[in-house]
Amino acid sequence: MRVSSPQGKFADGAARVDRQVLVRSEAWGKHLLHHYESGLVVHVHLGLYGSFTESAIPMGEPVGQVRMRLAGADFGTDLRGPTACEVLTAPEVGALVDRLGPDPLRRGADPDRAWRRIHRSRRPIGSLLMDQQVIAGVGNVYRAEVLYRHGIAPQRPGTALALDEWEALWADLVQLMRVGVRRGKMHVVRPEHDHGEPSYAPDRPRTYVYRRAGAPCRICGTPVAHSVLEGRNLFWCPACQPK
């Protein structure tokens, strides 16, 4: 694999893994790990604005601020705008993973680890679901939609969540996120509630509440509410998710 940093910010890191065999890639929550034959690992976190774009070999001149370029035999990819792009050793990867909560997409993930933190916390469940040290990988869309699907107000404290409610939330997150990976897009509206109404934006999945502030709830017609919780937009139905 040829690894470079056209932008220059990752030049030293790229040189450490350039011309090595990329053995495997894996994700832990929102953290992408590229494992190279030397044992070094490139850690990428896209954040809100990062993205990969793929193209066939030979790749053209870099466009924009390309943090990392990977070029294989037939295809390559450019990384732009990540929150993190760094080379880690095996112990550093272990420390990173140890800081994360269970990932619904990983087989063997233990939801009890998350439950032990949730049921002792007075923070809102809407905050806890987005805390990567509690659960790894849940973003704003899944947070809003899974709480709606189970009639749970995002403002409810973790201490007020029952174990059976948490078990149902976890099982639903596992199913929804795996479907999203398999299909390449999110599917969160149950078939019986999906009557083909437009999404909140072109080429985006239809949702119950996410990005639908002021629009009627798909089930009860109550206007979807919006607020900001810990710096992130929050959406819910006041009738279907009573406080």
How would you label these PLM feature ranges?
Residues 60-64, 73, 108, 119, ...:
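Short, amphipathic alpha-helical segments
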Residues 49, 73-75, 80, 86, ...:
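Generic hydrophobic/packing signal
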Residues 56-59, 96-107, 156-163:
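Short histidine-centered catalytic/ligand-binding loop motif
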Residues 2-18, 26, 31, 115-243:
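Basic, nucleic-acid-binding surfaces and adjacent catalytic neighborhoods in DNA/RNA-processing proteins
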Residues 1-100, 238-243:
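Acidic, proline/glycine-enriched N-terminal capping motif
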Residues 83-123:
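A short, charged helix-loop
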